[in-house]
Design a protein with these regions (language model features):
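Bacterial N-terminal signal peptides
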Residues: 6-17
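Beta-strand-centric surfaces of beta-sandwich/beta-rich domains
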Residues: 23-549
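Signal peptide processing junction and immediate N-terminal pro/mature segment
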Residues: 18-22
C-alpha cells in the first residue's frame, strides 16, 4: 500500500426549511426543467418510481428486419386518410428521443404529428424532413442532428397523454410505397408516477424557454468539444509510482459528493490500462460498488491517452459523411460525463457518500506504473437527500455467442449481459468494447432493457447496436451524451449516457445487447467468439456489490 489520505475538511451546510411545507412539493416538470437536466449532471443520483421505455420498429420475428415493423398502422377509409401511429401513451411523461433511419425526397410527403393531452390540434404538424432539419427546423443543433443518423433529443413533456403519428396524403393510393414512412423509427419516453406534475409543452416557446434552449445547446457543444473546467482547488491531488501488486488508497470521511475525478496512468499501454483496477467502497461497506479496470471505466483501454487512428466508421462534425472514405480521428474525446485528453482521463459522474468512501487503485498488470496521478473534487454536505443512490460501475467481459451465452427472443439470439441486478436503482449508461480487427460491421444486434419486468418483449427494444449510441448505418459520431473512443478495425469502443431518459427500477433491471453481425460479421461472432467488454454505470440504494468479472 503506497499512501492513505485522510479527510481534511468539514463544511457545515445550513438548510433553510420553509414553514409552509413547500419543501414537500416537488417542482412542476416543464420544458425548462427537462432542458436544465440535459446540461447538468448533479441530479443523476436521484431515484424515483418512473419508467423509461421505447416504441420502435424492431422485428417481432426476432430477426434483423428492424426497419419497417410498424406496430399500429391504421388503414385509410372513405372517412379517414389513415395514419401510422408511432406512440400512443398516457401521462404524465416526456418524450426524450425520436430517431428515424433516412430522410430523402422519397419521404417528402410524410408529415409527423404530435398531439398532447387529447388535443384536437397537434402541437407539431410538419414534414419529417423539416422536423429533423438542424438548420431551419423547430429545434436547434445539436438537440436535433443528422450526423450519422437523423434524430432529436429535444424533450417533449406531456401531462395526460401523447400521440405521435405519421400521415401521408398518398397512403393507400395506387403507387403507394411504405418506404415513404422512412424506417428504423425509435421513440424513447418516460412515464412518471401520478404525484409528479408535468406541464405539457407549449409551442412556440416563451422567452424564458428560448434562453433555456440556447443554454442547453451551447452546453452540449462545449461538452463534446472540450474538457470541463477544473475546480479552483482539488480536494486531493496525489502522484505516485506503483509496482505490480501495489495499491494507492484514498480515504474520505463524513458526507459528500465526488464531483469530478481525473486519473493519469503512465505508461498508457493496454496491458497497464486493462491491468490497473479501480475500486470504490461507499459508507463503510467492505465490498466495492465500483470495480473496473481504469481503461475500461474511461474507455481508453486500447487507445491510451489520445492517439490517432483511421476508420471508415468515423463521422466528425455536424454534417453526415458522404460515402465511405477513411477518416483520421483521435481517441481523445469529450462528453458531459467522461472524457480522455492527451494527458489524463476525467469523470463527472456525481458520486455521493453518507459515511465515508475508500478509493483503491491497484496495479494488477505485470508492468511497473511509472506515474499514477489521481485528482478529485469533493463537495461537502451536511447530509444526503433520502432519494439519492450511490454510484456503481460493473465491468464484465466474455466471448460472444458461446454455448454459455444467454439468449433472448423468438430466435434465441445470443446476448451480452451488460447489467442484471435486483433492488432499487437507476441505470445511466455504458461503455462498450468489442474485439474486432476487421473492416466489416459487427453490430446488427438490438439493445434490450427490462426494468421491473421479466417477460418478452422488454419495454425497451432497439433496432440495432449503433442506434443505442445515437448513431446509425454502421458508423458513429460524437455528441455530449454519446459517441466513440475507437472504431473498427481494432477495438471499437463506444459510450452512451442517460440523463432524463435514465432507467429507474424498483425491483430489478436487465440490460443486454444482441450479438449479431450480419454477413461476414455474423460468421465471425458465431465461429470465432470475439470478446465483448462492457462497463455499466448505475446508481443504487442501498449500496450493492459491483459484481464485476
Amino acid at each position: 500500500m503506497i499512501g492513505r489520505l485522510a479527510a481534511l475538511w468539514l463544511t457545515l451546510v445550513v438548510l433553510v426549511v420553509p414553514a409552509n411545507g413547500a419543501q414537500d412539493q416537488p417542482p412542476e416538470r416543464d420544458l425548462s426543467f427537462f432542458l436544465h437536466r440535459l446540461r447538468t449532471v448533479d441530479h443523476l443520483p436521484e431515484l424515483e418510481a418512473s419508467h423509461t421505455a421505447m416504441s420502435s420498429t424492431w422485428d417481432r420475428s426476432g430477426g434483423n428486419a428492424d426497419g419497417t415493423d410498424f406496430k399500429n398502422v391504421v388503414q385509410p377509409t372513405a372517412r379517414s386518410p389513415g395514419r401510422n401511429i408511432l406512440l400512443d401513451t398516457a401521462g404524465p411523461g416526456c418524450i426524450h428521443r425520436i430517431f428515424v433511419g433516412v430522410l430523402t425526397e422519397r419521404q417528402a410527403g410524410t408529415r409527423i404529428q404530435i398531439f398532447l393531452d387529447h388535443g384536437q390540434k397537434p402541437i407539431f404538424d410538419m414534414p419529417i424532413l423539416e422536423f429533423f432539419n438542424d438548420s431551419n427546423g423547430p429545434f436547434p443543433y445539436p438537440l436535433v442532428f443528422h450526423k450519422s443518423y437523423p434524430g432529436t433529443l429535444f424533450p417533449i413533456p406531456f401531462a395526460k397523454h401523447c400521440l405521435v403519428q405519421l400521415v401521408n396524403d398518398r397512403f393507400g393510393k395506387p403507387g403507394w410505397n411504405d418506404a415513404a414512412w422512412s424506417n428504423y423509427w425509435q421513440v424513447t419516453y418516460t412515464r412518471y408516477p401520478d404525484p409528479v406534475k408535468v406541464k405539457s409543452l407549449v409551442w412556440p416557446p416563451d422567452d424564458g424557454e428560448k434562453k433555456e434552449i440556447a443554454a442547453t445547446a451551447q452546453a452540449w457543444l462545449e461538452a463534446e468539444s472540450k474538457q470541463p473546467n477544473e475546480p479552483a482547488k482539488w480536494t486531493a491531488d496525489q502522484t505516485t509510482a506503483l509496482e505490480p501488486g501495489k495499491s494507492m488508497v484514498v480515504d474520505l470521511a463524513g458526507v459528500g459528493v465526488i464531483r469530478q475525478m481525473r486519473i493519469s496512468v503512465e505508461p498508457d499501454t493496454p496491458e497497464v490500462l486493462r491491468g490497473t483496477r479501480m475500486q470504490i467502497r461507499w459508507d463503510g461497506i467492505d465490498t466495492p460498488s465500483v470495480d473496473v479496470p481504469v481503461g475500461h471505466f474511461f474507455g481508453h483501454a486500447y487507445s491510451g491517452q489520445g492517439r490517432w487512428f483511421t476508420s471508415t466508421a468515423a463521422v466528425l462534425g455536424k454534417k453526415p459523411l458522404k460515402g465511405g472514405p477513411y477518416v483520421d480521428y483521435t481517441s481523445a474525446y469529450n462528453s458531459l460525463l467522461l472524457g480522455v485528453t492527451s494527458k489524463e482521463a476525467y469523470s463527472r459522474f456525481p458520486m455521493p457518500f453518507a459515511n465515508g468512501a475508500t478509493l483503491t487503485i491497484r496495479n494488477r498488470s505485470g508492468s511497473r506504473i511509472g506515474k499514477l496521478r489521481l485528482r478529485f473534487d469533493v463537495e461537502r454536505l451536511a447530509q444526503l437527500p433520502a432519494n439519492w443512490g450511490r454510484f456503481h460501475a460493473t465491468w464484465t467481459e466474455s466471448p460472444a455467442a458461446t454455448d454459455k451465452s444467454p439468449a433472448t427472443g423468438p430466435k434465441n439470439v445470443p446476448v451480452k449481459t451488460v447489467l442484471q441486478k435486483e433492488g432499487r436503482g437507476k441505470y445511466v449508461g455504458v461503455m462498450l468494447t468489442v474485439d474486432w480487427p476487421y473492416e466489416f460491421w459487427w453490430g446488427e444486434g438490438d439493445w434490450q432493457i427490462w426494468t421491473d419486468e421479466s417477460g418478452w418483449p422488454p419495454s425497451y427494444h432497439g433496432t440495432g447496436s449503433e442506434e443505442y449510441f445515437n448513431s446509425g448505418w454502421c458508423r458513429f459520431d460524437r455528441k455530449a451524451v454519446s459517441g466513440f473512443v475507437m472504431l473498427r478495425p481494432g477495438h471499437p469502443t463506444v459510450y452512451s449516457f442517460h440523463l432524463n431518459d435514465a432507467f429507474q427500477f424498483q425491483r430489478n433491471v436487465r440490460v443486454v445487447e444482441e450479438q449479431m453481425g450480419g454477413g461476414p460479421g455474423e460468421r465471425v461472432i458465431r465461429e470465432r467468439h470475439p470478446l465483448w467488454t462492457s462497463t455499466a454505470y448505475w446508481y443504487a440504494n442501498p449500496v450493492q456489490p459491483a459484481g464485476s468479472d
